[in-house]
Swiss-Prot record:
It comes from Homo sapiens. This is LMO7 downstream neighbor protein. It comes from the Eukaryota.
């Protein structure tokens, strides 16, 4: 996914981090996991945008990918209300359209997160 190359880094699991920028060393020592996540799952694919705050005056946004068993849009977090939007069986949305919407939404969230992280670093 090329939008991960914008300087947003990925977290493969709780014990490993990989970055596309080199100015955030020691990620495991600096991540505060108490900040909420936004989960988007449509057509069996789940994209997780996890917002992480960094100690020592730096911020980061973590993207991770996974799989979901049922198509749904789920948002939850400490600062946002819990909501679930289910896609009904026999939906008129073709899979390509659903994927496009999810991809566009994820890209927007990543771009917003990256813009905010850039403001905090300057």
């Amino acid at each position: 996914m090329t939008w991960l190359d914008k300087g947003v880094w990925t977290q493969e699991d709780e014990n490993s981090c990989s970055f596309s920028e080199s100015d955030f060393p020691g990620c495991r020592d600096q991540i505060n996991p108490s900040i909420p996540s936004i989960w988007t799952a449509v057509s069996g694919m789940m994209i997780s945008l996890e917002v992480r705050w960094w100690i020592k005056g730096k911020q980061g946004y973590v993207i991770s990918l996974g799989h979901a068993l049922s198509p749904r849009l789920e948002c939850s977090g400490t600062f946002s209300a819990h909501c679930i939007l289910g896609l009904p069986g026999g939906s008129s949305y073709p899979p390509a359209s659903v994927s496009q919407v999810v991809g566009t939404t994820a890209l927007y969230l990543v771009e917003e997160a990256w813009a905010e992280a850039g403001k905090m670093r300057s």
